[in-house]
């Protein structure tokens, strides 16, 4: 993307500072390593008591620049230093691929460590985390900064050691899961993650935007009747288009009146929306989503009788990840593979809410400007476009638009064939495995050798990308296209025009298109890019516009079918409009996810704060007597103050509180006593029993029981919130705002959760036996 006025103003301001850093080249040239480490210690100490000035920044950057020159032989250029200064301001730096973001990261991490902050560097996958830790980590270590790699599968001792480092490399999911696991431990000493000071996110658009739709979940197996999925599958397979309505770009499908009648008859229920039919309704809707909204080889792939999610933005399969809330089971039933048990959520957080907990956040990527509004609205981060060190020498052509996919396919083969014959390497980008395999078949038929990269063979990704710049190489890839890895050109390829990139479809996001184009023309290399699309592509097929439908019909009816592309400004405008609308729809989905998660986020913070206090104090924050009194007063009210229809519930609660406990007064006697008298008897008896224990023993017992009950009830509460979220759209569609209903009913569920674990804690207090143990 081009710079706007604000970008140019910021870049101009920092260009002068960057030039001064370069001028300091000789400042540390003659120092030994020990002397450089002394400088590091000097700056660390200084900023414990004093603020950092621009002059300080210049000297610190110059120190890191000298170390990088010695250890990895790279001298940071002015634009890399500008980018690092932008990152230091808590912004997103958009820097073209191949311009040296990895080296740029060194400077902002080093300066944040000098400020006294712990730094987390987040990458898209563990391979990149390991690679960057080895390359830049050695420079930081040369300067006396400790560096660690946060990997999955480590034990608590190993994790604790990692989190003592100044700089930690890892993936978003691993840092997020460490946070969730920390809030499930039973002892303070088992927590591993230290403070969330500063995070630098590589491929920020991928992590903060693309991955934001999938929350992080820690779960276990949930018992349920899996046969319902197979039964519902039979119903949905028989459904006709007249039975349901659908908005595919919003990922929403629902039954119309005919469909409701058919489903009620199938399940044998009077009303599908009655409380008794909630399971049947839920699973029917899940199977409808699986059949009508989730597409094989686009949203998921079936490998070795297992359904694997495909990341829509990279094209990679995601082993171990499952769609939540029963959707994965529905897809398994649809595909006729084993339906595995649904998981029960133990802890969850969205990527958005995890990273918003950091005191400071920065990001770097090759494509972010198109999503600046989202970065600003959700993360309070501006996007600044960093100029390239060398002029981009890639020729970007206007789209070729064809009437049909068949015509497009023929044109792609012709385009690739003549480039192949002259030896120019070509990268063909597709948006799905299905389209990837279709183009591959056309190339095979034309006798053009090529290598294929998609979710089915992602294990060979590094090897395939390494060969993509060789003379005469044709590479066919889904969106992944080796992001994070350079395509290096053979020396004799430059004179052939560099790497040619052919896009076979416009994606839902312009950003993904820019990423594909950015594979070519790196670091001043020559290159070429062009999109070859058709009126039958998914982007236009799902674009809902009456004016477009008329134009499309007119073009298909009147235009000559000679296989040549259509040059129409109107069609180009429609493509851009369709992308913008879908970007807006996807942004709304992510905002919607965040809005719903903010309800849980507030509740989660309250629960985790109470847990932390329990672990810190090693005893209850309030007296057990106070909790017992509140529960008893709530449970024992004069019958005349209770509505007649609630009397049965009232007596049941009393029986549940006292039943099976050591409380010496029988329930028959209790019913003859005044409520206030019962409360005082309960509290005084508990006080007498409690005093029989050593103070430390009873405090430990109460803490353990309270923590255990709170954790158990929290899991049940999360499950209830999931059920509420699923049902709220079904009940509210076309009526009241579902988010408002969710907020209101979610707050009521949270109050119930708090009341429940206090109630069962009070019950446990009345189970204290003479030996100091709690029964049950």
UniProtKB/Swiss-Prot annotation:
Monomer and homodimer. Part of the essential Sec protein translocation apparatus which comprises SecA, SecYEG and auxiliary proteins SecDF. Other proteins may also be involved. ATP binds at residues 80, 98-102, 486. InterPro entries: Helicase_ATP-bd (IPR014001), Helicase_C-like (IPR001650), P-loop_NTPase (IPR027417), SecA (IPR000185), SecA_DEAD (IPR011115), SecA_motor_DEAD (IPR014018), SecA_preprotein_X-link_dom (IPR011130), SecA_SF2_C (IPR044722). Its EC number is 7.4.2.8. The keyword Nucleotide-binding applies. Gene3D superfamilies: Helical scaffold and wing domains of SecA (1.10.3060.10), P-loop containing nucleotide triphosphate hydrolases (3.40.50.300), SecA, preprotein cross-linking domain (3.90.1440.10). Disulfide bonds: none annotated. One of its GO terms (molecular function) is ATP binding. HAMAP family: SecA (MF_01382). Belongs to the SecA family. Part of the Sec protein translocase complex. Interacts with the SecYEG preprotein conducting channel. Has a central role in coupling the hydrolysis of ATP to the transfer of proteins into and across the cell membrane, serving as an ATP-driven molecular motor driving the stepwise translocation of polypeptide chains across the membrane. Keywords: ATP-binding, Cell membrane, Cytoplasm, Dwarfism, Membrane, Nucleotide-binding, Protein transport, Translocase, Translocation, Transport. It holds the Pfam family SecA_SW. It catalyses: ATP + H2O + cellular proteinSide 1 = ADP + phosphate + cellular proteinSide 2. Disruption phenotype: Knockout causes a smooth to rough phenotype transition; cells grow as filaments longer than 10 um in length with septa between cells but no indentations. Knockout also causes a smooth to rough phenotype transition; cells grow as filaments longer than 10 um in length with septa between cells but no indentations. Changing residue 553 to T: In strain: SLCC7509. This is Protein translocase subunit SecA 2. Changing residue 627 to F: In strain: SLCC7510. One of its GO terms (biological process) is protein import. It comes from the Bacteria.
């Amino acid at each position: 993307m081009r710079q706007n006025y604000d970008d140019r103003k910021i870049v101009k301001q920092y260009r002068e500072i960057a030039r001064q850093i370069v001028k300091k080249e000789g400042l540390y040239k003659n120092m030994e390593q020990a002397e450089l480490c002394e400088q590091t210690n000097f700056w660390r100490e200084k900023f414990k008591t004093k603020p950092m000035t621009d002059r300080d920044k210049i000297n610190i950057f110059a120190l890191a620049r000298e170390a990088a020159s010695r250890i990895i032989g790279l001298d940071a250029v002015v634009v890399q230093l500008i980018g690092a200064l932008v990152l230091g301001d808590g912004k997103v730096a958009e820097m073209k691929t191949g311009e040296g973001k990895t080296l740029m990261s060194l400077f902002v991490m080093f300066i944040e460590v000098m400020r006294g902050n712990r730094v987390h560097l987040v990458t898209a996958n563990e391979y990149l985390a390991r690679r960057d830790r080895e390359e830049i980590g050695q420079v930081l270590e040369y300067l006396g900064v400790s560096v660690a790699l946060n990997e999955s599968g480590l034990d608590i001792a190993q994790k604790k050691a990692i989190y003592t480092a100044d700089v930690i490399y890892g993936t978003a999911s691993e840092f997020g899961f460490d946070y969730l696991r920390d809030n499930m431990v039973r002892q303070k000493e088992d927590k591993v993650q230290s403070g969330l000071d500063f995070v630098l996110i590589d491929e920020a658009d991928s992590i903060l935007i693309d991955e934001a739709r999938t929350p992080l979940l820690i779960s276990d197996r949930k018992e349920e009747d899996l046969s319902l999925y197979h039964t519902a599958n039979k119903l949905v397979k028989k459904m006709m288009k007249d039975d349901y309505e659908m908005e595919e770009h919003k990922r929403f499908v629902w039954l119309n009146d005919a469909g409701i009648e058919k489903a009620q008859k199938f399940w044998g229920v009077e009303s599908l929306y009655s409380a008794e039919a909630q399971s049947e309704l839920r699973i029917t809707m899940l199977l409808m989503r699986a059949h009508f909204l989730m597409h094989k080889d686009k949203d998921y792939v079936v490998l070795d009788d297992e359904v694997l999610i495909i990341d829509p933005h990279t094209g990679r399969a995601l082993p171990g990840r499952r769609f939540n809330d029963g959707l994965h089971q529905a897809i398994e039933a649809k595909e006729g593979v084993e339906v595995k048990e649904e998981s029960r959520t133990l802890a969850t957080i969205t990527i958005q809410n995890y990273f918003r907990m950091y005191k400071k956040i920065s990001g770097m990527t090759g494509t972010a400007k198109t999503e600046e509004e989202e970065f600003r609205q959700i993360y309070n981060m501006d996007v600044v476009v960093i100029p390239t060190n060398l002029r981009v020498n890639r020729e970007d052509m206007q789209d070729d638009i064809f009437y049909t996919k068949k015509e497009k396919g023929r044109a792609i083969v012709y385009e690739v064939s003549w480039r192949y014959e002259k030896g120019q390497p070509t990268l063909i980008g597709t948006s799905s495995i299905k389209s990837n395999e279709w183009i591959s078949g056309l190339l095979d038929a034309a006798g053009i050798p090529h290598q294929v990269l998609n979710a089915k063979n992602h294990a060979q990704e590094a090897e395939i990308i390494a060969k993509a710049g060789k003379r005469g190489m044709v590479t066919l890839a889904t969106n992944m296209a080796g992001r994070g890895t350079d395509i290096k050109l053979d020396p004799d390829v430059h004179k052939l025009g560099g790497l040619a990139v052919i896009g076979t479809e416009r994606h839902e996001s312009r950003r993904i298109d820019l990423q594909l184009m950015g594979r070519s023309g790196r670091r001043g290399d020559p290159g070429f890019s062009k999109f070859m699309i058709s009126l039958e592509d998914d982007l236009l097929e799902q674009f809902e516009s009456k004016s477009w439908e008329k134009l499309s019909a007119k073009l298909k009816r009147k235009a000559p079918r000679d296989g040549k592309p259509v040059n129409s400004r109107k069609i180009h405008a429609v493509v851009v409009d369709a992308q913008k609308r879908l970007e807006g729809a996807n942004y709304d989905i992510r905002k919607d996810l965040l809005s719903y998660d903010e309800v849980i986020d507030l509740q989660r913070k309250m629960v985790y704060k109470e847990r932390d206090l329990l672990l810190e104090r090693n005893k209850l924050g309030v007296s057990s007597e106070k909790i017992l009194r509140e529960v008893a007063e709530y449970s024992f009210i004069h019958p005349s103050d209770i509505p007649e229809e609630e009397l049965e519930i009232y007596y049941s609660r009393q029986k549940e509180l006292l039943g099976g406990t050591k409380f010496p007064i029988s329930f028959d006697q209790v019913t003859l006593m005044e409520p206030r008298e019962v409360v005082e008897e309960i509290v005084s008896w508990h006080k007498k029993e409690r005093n029989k224990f050593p103070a430390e023993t009873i405090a430990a017992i109460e803490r353990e029981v309270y923590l255990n009950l709170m954790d158990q009830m929290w899991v049940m509460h999360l499950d209830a919130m999931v059920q509420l979220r699923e049902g709220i759209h079904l009940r509210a569609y076309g009526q009241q705002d579902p988010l408002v209903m969710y907020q209101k009913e979610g707050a009521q569920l949270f109050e119930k959760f708090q009341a429940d674990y206090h109630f069962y804690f009070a019950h446990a207090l009345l189970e204290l036996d003479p030996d100091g143990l709690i029964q049950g």
